[in-house]
Amino acid sequence: MSIQTSDPNETSDLKSLSLIAAHSHITGLGLDENLQPRPTSEGMVGQLQARRAAGVILKMVQNGTIAGRAVLVAGPPSTGKTALAMGVSQSLGKDVPFTAIAGSEIFSLELSKTEALTQAFRKSIGIKIKEETELIEGEVVEIQIDRSITGGHKQGKLTIKTTDMETIYELGNKMIDGLTKEKVLAGDVISIDKASGKITKLGRSFARSRDYDAMGADTRFVQCPEGELQKRKTVVHTVSLHEIDVINSRTQGFLALFTGDTGEIRSEVRDQINTKVAEWKEEGKAEIVPGVLFIDEVHMLDIECFSFINRALEDEFAPIVMMATNRGVSKTRGTNYKSPHGLPLDLLDRSIIITTKSYNEQEIKTILSIRAQEEEVELSSDALDLLTKTGVETSLRYSSNLISVAQQIAMKRKNNTVEVEDVKRAYLLFLDSARSVKYVQENESQYIDDQGNVQISIAKSADPDAMDTTE
């Protein structure tokens, strides 16, 4: 057996792995300040009416006054329903919680359906908790650290000043280690949290800007603080209700947030937390931020889940629930009757419905051009036209998937630009759904049917030299 070894002198270019998702090109809804959609903006193309409706929902969420509303995004496949939800997510920012789940995610052996839905609802409610902390903020004048010969207890003094006053603080082991870790020197402007002992380096004083010293490119010069050394500052922490539930429900506390092993959380714990949060809200210590829960493929939920959502929407702590489905009149899971979009009529009655329409040829061309730019693929104009034609005749998803495949074929030809022949070869190598269905119908007898039957036919050879197997 031969073992291939690489030449040590040979250099290989290591490219960084950049994962590009289906909706990574979307950065917002593409609306102006009057909620009017631009034809192409922030990765969104077309669907003007649906985007404007989503913009109204976005304003409702940002105002934070209205919660417990259900929004259904309904439309044919490949019309941008998930993209619309991703646009809402990007526009909300990091302070407003956005939770995205698929309808099939809640069916788990570890959690009941109602528990999984409850956790998703609680993840979508944010709590802004205001906390007053005492800080020591000033410019370091001098640091004196006395270390014993035996390497035991360390002592030190920190001289710190503002423009109005100067003070000397005694340092213990923990503070000395913190200052050493942050590499604090004389002339640095620092902030010390009195409660936790956390040291934050704010920058270097302007008074030391002319000192002859080696400084990095990221060195920041700041003014020496004014007034008192000790200041009170209000800090705002944003957490979700689910995170508070987890911390208060298990023995390991916040460690369960990292392991993900939250398990079932008792309703008594949640009731106590709801009561405490309501108290904080009345006292002005906390502010409730209703977020968005997005349930994709909502028709996969069953009748018990829909009944739970009906009740949860009326709760005091309820987010805005966005749902997406591509079903028409279909059977509701867990029942024998059909209903529009596969949802019960009572939930449909509570929902406001946004419809998406199929993209036209020009919109498909624009979307494919954006996707190619996102995937860093250079397409020739003829190749883009052929991909657009393929997208119109088959589907947008199939045409979008051909971009990266055609790039690999072009790279094999040592060409950086994807040409028409690369797209044609990719089209012949990979079938779309319509051609796949046609192939299955033509060769149906060779496939195993739903009864487990398959027809295996062996054609007899007409070769005169073939071995005679007859007796």
Swiss-Prot record:
GO terms for cellular component: chromatin; Ino80 complex; NuA4 histone acetyltransferase complex; nucleus; R2TP complex; Swr1 complex; TTT Hsp90 cochaperone complex. Coiled coil: none annotated. Keywords: Activator, ATP-binding, Chromatin regulator, DNA damage, DNA repair, Helicase, Hydrolase, Nucleotide-binding, Nucleus, rRNA processing, Transcription, Transcription regulation. Changing residue 81 to A: Defect in snoRNA accumulation. Growth defect at 37 degrees Celsius. The keyword Nucleotide-binding applies. Its main location: nucleus. Changing residue 81 to R: Growth defect at 37 degrees Celsius. GO terms for biological process: box C/D snoRNP assembly; chromatin remodeling; DNA repair; protein stabilization; regulation of DNA-templated transcription; regulation of transcription by RNA polymerase II; rRNA processing. It is an enzyme of class 3 (hydrolase). Gene3D superfamilies: 1.10.8.60, P-loop containing nucleotide triphosphate hydrolases, RuvB-like helicase, domain II. Transmembrane segments: none annotated. It is found in: Nucleus, Nucleoplasm. Belongs to the RuvB family. Present with 3030 molecules/cell in log phase SD medium. Probably forms a homohexamer. Interacts with RVB1 and may form heterododecamers with RVB1. Component of the SWR1 chromatin remodeling complex composed of at least ACT1, ARP4, RVB1, RVB2, ARP6, YAF9, VPS71, VPS72, SWC3, SWC4, SWC5, SWC7 and SWR1, and perhaps BDF1. Component of the chromatin-remodeling INO80 complex, at least composed of ARP4, ARP5, ARP8, RVB1, RVB2, TAF14, NHP10, IES1, IES3, IES4, IES6, ACT1, IES2, IES5 and INO80. Also belongs to the R2TP complex composed of at least RVB1, RVB2, TAH1 and PIH1. Interacts with SPT15/TBP. This is RuvB-like protein 2.
